[in-house]
Amino acid sequence: LMGAASQSTGYEINQSIRFSDNDSARLARTVSSSGSLTTWTLSGWIKRGRYTSNVNNQWFAVYTASAGSTAYDAPLNFNDAAAGGSFSVYLAGQNWRTTALARDTSAWYHVVTVWDSTNGTASDRMRLYVNGERQTDFSITGSVSSGLNSRWNSSSYSHHRIGNLNYN
């Protein structure tokens, strides 16, 4: 990972990665064939490096995009101070932003995003869990129609990335 190798943490966590906010460090994967676009789960542990007031800064994002396009899905974002330090999810043209805040730079967060657009209960089609607690209070709430495809897992949006949110 460019720019991250020189960062010192004082300790090492196996199978982990640290991104520097001073560069465009990210992991990228090209998807050769699509997985399910209607039912999937994304889970991971994340830690905020710092909390900033930058208006458009997404400090951490997991996202997929198509080269040269501004269309993207971001199943998980840390938001900056302009958005209150919340978590957000952007999928299939819909957006959710939690009222719960993630401002603690010393805390690890276990975050799970569940996309199930086949679920008969509309409010269960996108679920977000932070540290085992389902997030149900959102300042922005998307609406998922039955069977709606996400871009996540799609080979049409072949650039799957973790790190800097830059979709071009």
Question: Language model features by range: what are they?
Answer:
Residues A4-N168:
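Extracellular glycan-associated modules
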